[in-house]
Amino acid sequence: LVDTLPDITWCLNQVLLEQGCPALTAETVRGYIGGGVTAMIERVATQFGIADAVALHQRYVTLYQNNLVQFSRPFSGVLALLEGCRQLQVPLAIVTNKTEEMARQVADALLPQNTFGTILGHRAGRALKPEPEVAWEAAQRLSVDPQRCLFVGDTEIDLKTARAAGMYSAAVTWGYGLTPTLQAQAPNFCCEQPAGLLRILQQVCGTAHVFTDHGDTVKSY
């Protein structure tokens, strides 16, 4: 939905510069995204031999909380996608490994109000993706059968979550994941642009069979 890489990169580089480490390119940071902030910081700490990953994590989180939407913007085409979903009356939820508070702040700042029925992020006692519980919780809050849900994501962790939760999956290649990596997870759909995802929803909304017309072949949009 939102390209948060610029703010993540900026904050991470500020923390690294404080440690006397060189700055990372956005493309390098892109490869570290997935699995939550703790996993990202652990990868960075390992790369630079930083012993106190906990302190690094705390400093990064503090900085990022104050710079959530300095450079972040919705991906091109996302606002039109959300408007299309509104017209189709598709119930939507956000499921993220960001902290729930951060996810809500980003959505409130950059996405249309009242778009999402629920926003679920990381918090104490809630397992991160790819564990399926958070996806099931989202479906429950939307009053939708998980087997009728389409779980959309740009990382292999998202697609593993969909599989674990028994949901249909759509890989989107405009985000952070590499297309071959996403395709290796055999998603039900693969979308290069938000408009492609909207076409999927337009095709299946109001039909009784719900997604089953695609068979076992990945459809690209």
Residue ranges and their predicted role:
Residues C21-P22, I50, P112, V144:
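Helix N-cap/coil-helix junction residues
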Residues I8-T9, A26, V37-I41, A53, ...:
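A general structural signal for well-ordered alpha-helical segments in protein cores
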Residues L1-G31, Q47:
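Active-site neighborhood of HAD-like aspartate-dependent phosphohydrolases
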Residues R86, T99-E100, R104-Y221:
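Asp-based, Mg2+/Mn2+-dependent phosphohydrolase catalytic module
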Residues V15-L16, G36-I50, V106, A138-A139:
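Helix-loop "lid/cap" segments that line or gate small-molecule binding pockets
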Residues N66-I94, E100-Q105, P132:
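Short, acidic loop-to-helix structural element flanking the phosphoryl-transfer center
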Residues R43-A80:
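Metal-dependent phosphoesterase signature
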